[in-house]
A protein has these predicted regions:
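Conserved catalytic core of the tyrosine transesterase superfamily
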Residues: 1-290
Length: 290
């Protein structure tokens, strides 16, 4: 009876279901970005099944038909398909305390695209052409520490351990803390930035205090790419890809790179070795110099 009271939803009220889903994801300490993704996927699914009186009455065949229609029409990527199926499974688990078998709906083949990255020369141009001290500090921190956008925005002043030469990154993806090195060049820039802007809690704060916004960082990078005349498109995550790629190109052990990036599985890190393999293919043969 307790389970019925706790998990049963008398009608297909998407708003209540999504609100409850969010609360239970929060209770399980999922990251903010993960919760938003789960909710977005769940919302799309709930619109499709709104004709049913409750979640419990949706047949698995209709869930399969929903995913199949998306795939057959070429409307979704492999990663989107994985996310959609995963969100539906998680919603049933947390809302109805029910594990549904949907593994056969996951794509079996992975068509991973090689991540885009900036060349070392492009990174140098981006930083050299960024005159605003705060903007330069932000871009330099992303690249020199291989940070995700959320990790950058969550950095606090106390996380910068200048005496130890490290930066502590709290509750990154997978809810695991990690430590990255604090390069001397970055430390010098951050000291100048701190003296000029005097942030109170977060390393990078908005005009009225509090966390700097995602949109602001994205605009900073966009303008920096234009000023540096970098033709290739790039996002904040491209800075992280560049960090990883340049480390491996410099001969840093893949296992160390894995820890620095905060990857749970080394297979995720291995994608960067494919990029360096392409570079090796471009290496001239000694015959070319004869």
């Amino acid at each position: 009876k307790q389970n019925i009271i706790k998990y049963y939803f008398p009608d297909m009220n998407s708003e209540i279901i999504l609100e409850t889903f969010e609360k239970r994801l929060l209770m399980q300490r999922y990251a903010g970005n993960t919760i938003r993704s789960y909710k977005d996927y769940a919302s799309i699914f709930l619109k499709h099944v709104s004709k049913y009186p409750s979640l419990e009455e949706i047949p698995l065949s209709d869930i399969e038909a929903f995913i199949n229609e998306k795939v057959q029409n070429g409307k979704i990527s492999v990663s989107y398909q994985k996310g959609l199926v995963g969100a539906i499974k998680k919603m049933y688990e947390l809302i109805l305390d029910k594990k549904i078998q949907l593994d056969y709906l996951y794509p079996k083949r992975s068509f991973s695209k090689l991540p885009k990255f900036f060349s070392k020369e492009e990174v140098r141009n981006i930083l050299d052409n960024t005159q605003n001290l705060k903007h330069k500090a932000i871009l330099m921190t992303i690249y020199s520490c291989g940070l995700r956008l959320s990790e950058l925005l969550n950095l606090k002043i106390k996380d910068i351990k200048s005496s130890d030469g490290i930066i502590r990154i709290h509750q990154s993806k997978g809810n695991k803390d990690r430590i990255v090195s604090l390069p001397d060049k970055l430390l010098a820039t951050l000291r100048h930035y701190y003296q000029a802007f005097k942030p109170k809690e977060y390393l990078f704060e908005g005009e009225k205090g509090g966390k700097y916004s995602e949109r602001s960082v994205q605009l900073i990078l966009k303008k920096a790419l234009i000023k540096a005349n970098v033709q290739s498109e790039g996002s904040v995550h491209t800075g992280r890809h560049s960090y990883a790629t340049h480390l491996i190109q410099s001969g840093i052990d893949i296992r160390i790179v894995k820890e620095l990036l905060g990857h749970e599985n080394i297979k995720t890190t291995m994608i960067y070795t494919h990029i360096t393999d392409i570079d090796k293919q471009k290496t001239p043969s000694p015959l070319d110099f004869l």
